[in-house]
Amino acid sequence: MAAMKTADIRAMTPDQMDDAITSLKKERFNLRFQRATGQLENTSRMREARRDIARIKTIAAQKRDAKK
């Protein structure tokens, strides 16, 4: 899964954002185990997943603040 584009995230509904965050957190969990057991080949994916989560949370906060 490639890094998420900002435009794609902005087009998401709040429920879709929550689902995306949940799936990315599960992916990070699995990546941590792969790293611990020496099976992780693409180490940069851990960084991408962490930043995707932050990107989604940032845009969600911006949308929430814009409604006020």
Curated annotation (Swiss-Prot):
The keyword Ion transport does not apply. InterPro entries: Ribosomal_protein_uL29 (IPR050063), Ribosomal_uL29 (IPR001854), Ribosomal_uL29_CS (IPR018254), Ribosomal_uL29_sf (IPR036049). Belongs to the universal ribosomal protein uL29 family. This is Large ribosomal subunit protein uL29. CDD domains: Ribosomal_L29_HIP. It comes from Nitrobacter winogradskyi (strain ATCC 25391 / DSM 10237 / CIP 104748 / NCIMB 11846 / Nb-255). SUPFAM superfamilies: Ribosomal protein L29 (L29p). It holds the Pfam family Ribosomal_L29. Keywords: Ribonucleoprotein, Ribosomal protein. GO terms for biological process: translation.
